[in-house]
C-alpha cells in the first residue's frame, strides 16, 4: 500500500475524542468528535485500510478537501494514519444532511429549495473554477450547520479536470442523480463539470418531492432509460404548486445536451437564485426538523384507517382441558410429521442463512450494467450481518454511490412489448445455456455474491424446536377462539429480541402473536388495513391490502419499536392513526409499492443461481416484475408487461431455470391420467415478453392442475384434484421419486415435507411418502373444517366447527422440528 500524502502519522486520539457515530460516507463511517485543542466539534471519517487497497480515491478526497477552502465546502482540519486506520477530520455540520431533514419535515418550501440551490451553486462554482468535479451531488451530501449554512460534503468520488484531460471517462456517481452523459459515458465520449449542474437539478426535485425522479425503478433500469437517446429530462410532477421561475431553473439545469447546459456561475444569475433568500429560511427548517409534530400529513393515512374500530388487542379464550379437546387436537399430539422442506426458490431472510463472499472480477461480463454492479460492490467492501448493524444509526447516505468502474458499453435492451414477444411452446420449459456474448439481465446489488447456505441456523425464542429429531414434529395450538377473518399468515423472528411472532393478515387488519409469550395469549394489532396476502423478506413485511388493494411494504422492526414506544406513553386516541399522521410518507414505516393498485395476487421467488429475488404482481390488465434491491431494502420495478394474463386471478407460479436470469411464469398445467404421463406446463417467458395468445385449459376441467410448486432446481410438485405428480421442469416424471401420489379426497392445499407430501382437505390431512406413495400421516376430524393459512417456512393451520362456519377459529403451527429460523 503506497503512502498517503499530507497525512500525519501521529496518534489522532491525542487530539480528537470520538463522541458518537453519525453516519457513513463513501468509504468509511463518520463520527462526531471533539477537538481537544480548540474544544470545537469535528466530523471524523475513519477508513480501515488493508494491504493492497487502492488508496487513490482517498488521496483524491484529502487533496480536494485540503485545496478547496470555501464557505460552502466542508472545511478540512487534517488527516491521520494510525494502525491501518485513516482518520479524515473535517468541520462538523450540526444540522445534518438535507436528506435527514426532509425525512423529518416533509418537502421543503420553494424558497428553501432556492436557498439550498444558490449556496450549493456557489460551492460548485468554486470547485469547477479549480478544475474539480464533485460527481455525487444529492440531498445526502449537502450538509447544514446550525446557522443554516449549506456545505458540499463527501468528496470520495470527486475527480479533477486538467488541461490534458478535458473530460472524465469513468462511470461514477449515484444512479438517480446521474447525468445522461455519465450514464452513456462510452457512447458520449466523456463528461465534464456540468454533470454536477444536472445532479443539483435532480436534487432540487428531490427536496420538493422527497425522492429523485425514476426512484421507483431499479437503479439499473433507470440507468438504461437515461442512456437512451429518447430519454426526456424530468420535470416537477405538480406544475401548479411551483412558480415559473422554479420550472425554468430546472429546465436549464436539466438540459440534456451538456454543451447547452449552463454553468454553475450562469445559474447563480437566474431569478430563482437571485431573489431575496435569507439564512432564516433554513434555520426555520432546522427548527421544524427538531419538532416532529410539525411534520406533514401523509396522503396515505386514509388507507391505514380502514378498521380502527376493531380492538387493538385480542385475547385467546381459555384452552380446553384434555377431555374437551376436539378429535383432531388429540390426534395432533399423536401423529408426528417431518419438517417442511425448504424450497430453493425461497428468499433467504436471515443473516445466518447465507455467507456472502465476493467473487473475482473475472466472473463479470463486459456490460455497462455489470460495471455499475461492480461499482456498487466496491461501495460496500465489507458486508456485515444485520445483527451487527442493528445497534448503529442508519447511514446518512441511504442510496449507494457508484464509484470506480471499467469503461464499458451498454448492451442492447430487449423490448417488453407483448407484440414483440416470442412464444413458448406449452409443456416445455426450455433453458438453453447463455452464450458467451449474452449479457446478464439487471443483476442485483448482490448478484456477484455467492451464497453458502449450509450454516447452522441460530436459535430463536418461540415454539420449542427439537433439532435433529426425525419425524418429531406435531401441530400445536397457539390461539383459541380467534374472531378475525384471516386470509394469510406468516412467522417472523425479531432480529433484536429473537422472539418468534405469528403475523396474520385479516379483514380487520394485520395482527401479531408473540410465540415466546403464549402464556399472555394476546394478539396485538400492527396495521389497521384489510389484508389478503402476506410475505416476509429481510424483515420487510409485504402485504396485499388497503381499500383499493395495493402491495404495501412494512418495516417490521420499526413498527414493533413504534408500538413499544406507544405502550410506554399511551394516548387517548388510537395511536396507530396519530403516528402515521406525523410521519412524512417518505419516512413512513408502511409504504405503497407504486403502480400496484388493483393487484389481484402476488408471488415472491428467488433465483438460486444468481441470488436475485423477484416479486410478481398480477393486475387486471398487466403483470409487474419487481426486483429486490438490497441497498434500499425494497422491491423496485424491473418490467411492466402491458399484456394481460390469460387469467389474472388464476394460477400464478414462478419457475426458475438454470441459465435464465428472470423467472418464467406458469399460468396453468395439465396432465393426462396415468403416473407415467408427462405434465404440460403453460408458461410465459418473461425475458421474451408475455405471449398473449397462449391457450390455457379452463380451471376445473379434468386434467387441470390446481397447484404447482417448485421445490428444488429441477423438481416440481403438480397437484391435481386427487393426486400429486412429481416431475422435472420438462414435465417428465422423476426417476428417484414416486411419479404419482394418490389421495381419496379432493385436495385443497399441498405442502412438501422433508420426505413426504402433506395434502390438506376440508376435514383433515394425509401425508404420503415421496419414495413409496405409502401413507405416513393421517388426521381426520369431520367436526372441524381446516384451512392452511401459510406454508412459507412454517405451516400455519386454522380450524372452525363444521356445524358453525361463522364461529371463532383455532390456530395451529407445525412445531417440534428443527427451527425454521
From Swiss-Prot:
Keyword terms: ATP-binding, Cell membrane, Cytoplasm, Golgi apparatus, Immunity, Innate immunity, Kinase, Membrane, Nucleotide-binding, Phosphoprotein, Serine/threonine-protein kinase, Stress response, Transferase, Ubl conjugation
Activity control mechanisms: The tumor necrosis factor (TNF), as well as endotoxins and pro-inflammatory stimuli such as polyinosine-polycytidine (poly(IC)), lipopolysaccharides (LPS), peptidoglycan (PGN), flagellin, or lipid A activate MAP4K2 by promoting its autophosphorylation.
Highest taxon of the lineage: Eukaryota
Domain Protein kinase residues, every copy: 16-273
Chain residue ranges for the region called PEST1: 294-314
One MF annotation (Gene Ontology) recorded for this entry: mitogen-activated protein kinase kinase kinase binding
E.C. number: 2.7.11.1
Regions of compositional bias (Low complexity) in chain numbering: 425-442
Main subcellular localisation: cytoplasm
Reactions listed under catalytic activity: L-seryl-[protein] + ATP = O-phospho-L-seryl-[protein] + ADP + H(+); L-threonyl-[protein] + ATP = O-phospho-L-threonyl-[protein] + ADP + H(+)
Region (PEST3): 405-449
Any single Gene Ontology cellular-component annotation: basolateral plasma membrane
Binding site for ATP: 22-30, 45
UniProt cofactor(s): Mg(2+)
Active-site positions on this chain: 136
Post-translational modification: Polyubiquitinated through 'Lys-48'-polyubiquitin chains, allowing proteasomal turnover. Ubiquitination requires the kinase activity of MAP4K2/GCK.
Entry's family note: Belongs to the protein kinase superfamily. STE Ser/Thr protein kinase family. STE20 subfamily.
PANTHER family for this protein: MITOGEN-ACTIVATED PROTEIN KINASE KINASE KINASE KINASE 2, STERILE20-LIKE KINASE, ISOFORM B-RELATED
Name this protein carries in UniProt: Mitogen-activated protein kinase kinase kinase kinase 2
Species of the source: Mus musculus
Upper taxonomic lineage: Eukaryota, Metazoa, Chordata, Craniata, Vertebrata
Amino acid at each position: 500500500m503506497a503512502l498517503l500524502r499530507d497525512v500525519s502519522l501521529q496518534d489522532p486520539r491525542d487530539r480528537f475524542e470520538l463522541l458518537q457515530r453519525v453516519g457513513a460516507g463513501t468509504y468509511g463511517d463518520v463520527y462526531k468528535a471533539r477537538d481537544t485543542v480548540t474544544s470545537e466539534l469535528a466530523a471524523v471519517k475513519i477508513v480501515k485500510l488493508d494491504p493492497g487497497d487502492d488508496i487513490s480515491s482517498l488521496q483524491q478526497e484529502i487533496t480536494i478537501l485540503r485545496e478547496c477552502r470555501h464557505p460552502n465546502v466542508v472545511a478540512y482540519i487534517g488527516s491521520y494514519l494510525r494502525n491501518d486506520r485513516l482518520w479524515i477530520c473535517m468541520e462538523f455540520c450540526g444540522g445534518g444532511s438535507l436528506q435527514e431533514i426532509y425525512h423529518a419535515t416533509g418537502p421543503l418550501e420553494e424558497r428553501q429549495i432556492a436557498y439550498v440551490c444558490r449556496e450549493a451553486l456557489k460551492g460548485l462554482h468554486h470547485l469547477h473554477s479549480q478544475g474539480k468535479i464533485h460527481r455525487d451531488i444529492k440531498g445526502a451530501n449537502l450538509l447544514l450547520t446550525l446557522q443554516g449554512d449549506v456545505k458540499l460534503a463527501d468528496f470520495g468520488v470527486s475527480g479533477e479536470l486538467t488541461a490534458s484531460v478535458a473530460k472524465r471517462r469513468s462511470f461514477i456517481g449515484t444512479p438517480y442523480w446521474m447525468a445522461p452523459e455519465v450514464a452513456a459515458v462510452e457512447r458520449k465520449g466523456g463528461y465534464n463539470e456540468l454533470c454536477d449542474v444536472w445532479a443539483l437539478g435532480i436534487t432540487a426535485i428531490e427536496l420538493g418531492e422527497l425522492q429523485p425522479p425514476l426512484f421507483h425503478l431499479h437503479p439499473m433500469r433507470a440507468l438504461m432509460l437515461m442512456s437512451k437517446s429518447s430519454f426526456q429530462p424530468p420535470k416537477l410532477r405538480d406544475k401548479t404548486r411551483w412558480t415559473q421561475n422554479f420550472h425554468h431553473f430546472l429546465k436549464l439545469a436539466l438540459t440534456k445536451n451538456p454543451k447547452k447546459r449552463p454553468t454553475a456561475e450562469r445559474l447563480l444569475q437566474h431569478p430563482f437564485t437571485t431573489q431575496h433568500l435569507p439564512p432564516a429560511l433554513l434555520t426555520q427548517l432546522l427548527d421544524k426538523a427538531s419538532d416532529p409534530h410539525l411534520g406533514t400529513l401523509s396522503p396515505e393515512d386514509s388507507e391505514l384507517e380502514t378498521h380502527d374500530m376493531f380492538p387493538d388487542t385480542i385475547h385467546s379464550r381459555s384452552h380446553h382441558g384434555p377431555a374437551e379437546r376436539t378429535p383432531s387436537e388429540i390426534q395432533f399430539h399423536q401423529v408426528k410429521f417431518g419438517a417442511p422442506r425448504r424450497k430453493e426458490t425461497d428468499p433467504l431472510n436471515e443473516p445466518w442463512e447465507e455467507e456472502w463472499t465476493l467473487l473475482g472480477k473475472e466472473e463479470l461480463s463486459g456490460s455497462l450494467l455489470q460495471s455499475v454492479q461492480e461499482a456498487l460492490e466496491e461501495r460496500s467492501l465489507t458486508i456485515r450481518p444485520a445483527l451487527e448493524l442493528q445497534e448503529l444509526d442508519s447511514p446518512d447516505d441511504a442510496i449507494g454511490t457508484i464509484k470506480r468502474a471499467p469503461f464499458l458499453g451498454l448492451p442492447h435492451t430487449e423490448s417488453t412489448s407483448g407484440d414483440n414477444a416470442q412464444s413458448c411452446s406449452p409443456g416445455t420449459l426450455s433453458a438453453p445455456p447463455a452464450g458467451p456474448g449474452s449479457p446478464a439481465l439487471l443483476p442485483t446489488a448482490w448478484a456477484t455474491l455467492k451464497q453458502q447456505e449450509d450454516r447452522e441456523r441460530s436459535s430463536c425464542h418461540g415454539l420449542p424446536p427439537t433439532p435433529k429429531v426425525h419425524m418429531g414434529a406435531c401441530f400445536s395450538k397457539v390461539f383459541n377462539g380467534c374472531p378475525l377473518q384471516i386470509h394469510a399468515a406468516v412467522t417472523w423472528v425479531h432480529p433484536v429480541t429473537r422472539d418468534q411472532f405469528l403475523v396474520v393478515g385479516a379483514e380487520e387488519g394485520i395482527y401479531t402473536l408473540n410465540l415466546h409469550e403464549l402464556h399472555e395469549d394476546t394478539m396485538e394489532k400492527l396495521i389497521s388495513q384489510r389484508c389478503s396476502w402476506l410475505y416476509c423478506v429481510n424483515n420487510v413485511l409485504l402485504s396485499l391490502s388497503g381499500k383499493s388493494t395495493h402491495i404495501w411494504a412494512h418495516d417490521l422492526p420499526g413498527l414493533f419499536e413504534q408500538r413499544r414506544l406507544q405502550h410506554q406513553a399511551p394516548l387517548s386516541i388510537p395511536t396507530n392513526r396519530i403516528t402515521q399522521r406525523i410521519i412524512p410518507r417518505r419516512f413512513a414505516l408502511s409504504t405503497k409499492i407504486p403502480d400496484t393498485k388493483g393487484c389481484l395476487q402476488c408471488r415472491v421467488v428467488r433465483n438460486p443461481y444468481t441470488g436475485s429475488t423477484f416479486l410478481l404482481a398480477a393486475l387486471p390488465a398487466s403483470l409487474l416484475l419487481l426486483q429486490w434491491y438490497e441497498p434500499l431494502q425494497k422491491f423496485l420495478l424491473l418490467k411492466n408487461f402491458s399484456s394481460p394474463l390469460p387469467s389474472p386471478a388464476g394460477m400464478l407460479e414462478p419457475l426458475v431455470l438454470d441459465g435464465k436470469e428472470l423467472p418464467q411464469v406458469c399460468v396453468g398445467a395439465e396432465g393426462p391420467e396415468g403416473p407415467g404421463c408427462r405434465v404440460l406446463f403453460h408458461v410465459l417467458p418473461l425475458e421474451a415478453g408475455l405471449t398473449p395468445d397462449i391457450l390455457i385449459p379452463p380451471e376445473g376441467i379434468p386434467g387441470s392442475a390446481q397447484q404447482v410448486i417448485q421445490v428444488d432446481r429441477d423438481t416440481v410438485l403438480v397437484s391435481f384434484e386427487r393426486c400429486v405428480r412429481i416431475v422435472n421442469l420438462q414435465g417428465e416424471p422423476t426417476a428417484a421419486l414416486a411419479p404419482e401420489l394418490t389421495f381419496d379426497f379432493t385436495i385443497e392445499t399441498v405442502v412438501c415435507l422433508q420426505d413426504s407430501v402433506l395434502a390438506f382437505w376440508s376435514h383433515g390431512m394425509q401425508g404420503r411418502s415421496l419414495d413409496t406413495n405409502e401413507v405416513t400421516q393421517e388426521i381426520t376430524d369431520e367436526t372441524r373444517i381446516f384451512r392452511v393459512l401459510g406454508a412459507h417456512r412454517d405451516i400455519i393451520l386454522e380450524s372452525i366447527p363444521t356445524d358453525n362456519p361463522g364461529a371463532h377459529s383455532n390456530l395451529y403451527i407445525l412445531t417440534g422440528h428443527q427451527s425454521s429460523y
